[in-house]
């Protein structure tokens, strides 16, 4: 017999959303630094992604 699922609490939703945002931010930082290091033209600088503050996180 089918049973309705319990509703996910707002705090759980917020925690999961923040984890997802954090993962995407660090992947953006990593890809930006990789693109910066692999740039073949010396004079051209790649545009920074939106929301990028320039501070790199310690690994």
Swiss-Prot record:
Gene Ontology biological-process entries: translation
Alphabetic keyword roster: Chloroplast, Plastid, Ribonucleoprotein, Ribosomal protein
Cellular component, GO annotation: chloroplast; large ribosomal subunit
Family matches, as InterPro entries: Ribosomal_bL32 (IPR002677), Ribosomal_bL32_plant/cyanobact (IPR044958), Ribosomal_zn-bd (IPR011332)
Localization terms from the record: Plastid, Chloroplast
One Gene Ontology MF term: structural constituent of ribosome
Lineage top rank: taxon: Eukaryota
Transmembrane segments: none
Ranges where the record places region Disordered: 37-59
Pfam families: Ribosomal_L32p
Record's keyword annotation contains Plastid: yes
Parts forming coiled coils: none
Signal peptide as annotated in the record: none
Protein family per UniProt: Belongs to the bacterial ribosomal protein bL32 family.
Protein name: Large ribosomal subunit protein bL32c
Source organism per UniProt: Sorghum bicolor
